[in-house]
Swiss-Prot record:
Membrane-topology descriptor: Multi-pass membrane protein
Species for this entry: Rattus norvegicus (Rat)
Cellular component aspect of the GO annotation: membrane
Protein name: Taste receptor type 2 member 102
Name of the gene this protein is made from: Tas2r102
Similarity field: Belongs to the G-protein coupled receptor T2R family.
Transmembrane segments: 8-28, 47-67, 88-108, 125-145, 180-200, 230-250, 261-281
Superkingdom as given in the UniProt entry: Eukaryota
Record GO terms (molecular function): bitter taste receptor activity; G protein-coupled receptor activity
Length: 327
């Protein structure tokens, strides 16, 4: 691989790594701070908190994989790959199921439907979410009992162990790809069904608005479109994440470092970008982020809040106070 391409790809991976930790870390700290102050969290906040934690773990696993394969002095040891395999699968498992729980939450909370089963599930929303997450634990024994890698030390790029190293790396990505294919069918299908039902609910709602000659800017329409934006981004980014693992597996089979790094770059998009979209789609998180940014701006320009005469208030001060009052 060309040094320039490798350097650019490495820079991009580090940017995604930092961005993903910041966006997910912000969700964790914001909800944790609310819990400390209010001593309680809503169902949606609990889902976002656990989802962000699982994605932070997933981001670190992908980054660890990158440094293990392409680090200048890293050793890939069988036991290390086993630990990386288990933690990667677990973080992917919980990240997918928590995102699915978020999709179902949006569906039951926002959609308008007169079906009896829907009304029953909507009335027992919290129990449905908890029951689904507990049911997801049934799949863990199947994940944890998969055949592990042999314990054999080797150095990436070495002359004597390069073939065995690349074989085990290919086996590693093959195991992850196999598990994600098998165990993600149900949650991904549930999220897709929730997405389709929410589209159907939005269509019915817009049709009702047209018949009543009302505009499309009502709160229900905005809630539908916001939830759909979050759900379609999740489905799209998770599909990209799945394809990134397929790329990595193909790259290990054909010894293509460039394709493997492209797979890592696209894989980091899923846990990083979707969390940023969640922040934009959540009014509380959005207001908190705006308040923090305005507060930092006022801190950086603290000497300019008042003019030299001490009478005129600058726009920085007004912006800071306005955001504080909104939050």
């Amino acid at each position: 691989m060309e040094p320039v391409i490798y350097s650019f790809a490495t820079l991009l991976i580090h940017v995604e790594f930092i961005f993903g930790n910041l966006s997910n870390g912000f969700i964790v700290l914001s909800n944790f701070w609310d819990w400390v102050i209010k001593r309680k969290l809503s169902t949606i906040d609990k889902i976002l908190l656990t989802l962000a934690i699982s994605r932070i773990t997933l981001i670190w696993e992908i980054y660890t994989w990158f440094t293990s394969v392409y680090g200048p002095s890293s050793f890939a040891i069988g036991m290390k790959l086993q630990i990386l395999y288990f933690t990667w699968i677990l973080s992917s498992h919980f990240s997918l199921w928590f995102a699915t729980a978020l999709s179902i939450f949006y569906l039951l909370r926002i959609a308008n439907c007169s079906w009896k089963i829907f009304l029953y599930l909507k009335w027992r929303l919290k129990q449905v979410i908890v029951g689904m997450l507990l049911a997801s634990l049934v799949f863990l024994p199947g994940i944890l009992t998969q055949r592990t890698l042999e314990e054999r030390p080797y150095r990436y790029g070495g002359n004597t162990s390069e073939d065995s190293m690349e074989t085990d790396f290919a086996r590693f990505t093959e195991l992850i790809l196999f598990n994600l294919t098998i165990f993600s069918v149900i949650p991904f299908s549930l999220a897709s069904i929730s997405f389709l039902l929410l589209i159907f609910s939005l269509w019915k709602h817009l049709r009702k608005m047209q018949l009543s000659s009302r505009g499309h800017g009502d709160p229900s329409t905005k809630a539908h479109t916001n939830a759909l934006r979050i759900m379609v981004s999740f489905l799209l980014l998770y599909s990209i994440y799945f394809l990134s693992l397929l790329l990595s597996w193909i790259a290990q089979k054909h010894h293509s470092k460039l394709v493997d790094i492209i797979g890592i770059i696209t894989g980091l998009m899923y846990p990083s970008a979707h969390s940023f979209i969640l922040i934009l789609g959540n009014s509380k998180l959005m207001q908190t982020s705006l308040w923090i940014l305005s507060h930092l701006r006022c801190r950086l320009k603290g000497e300019n809040i008042l003019n030299p005469s001490g009478n005129q208030v600058t726009s920085c001060y007004i912006f800071c106070i306005a955001n504080k009052s909104v939050s």
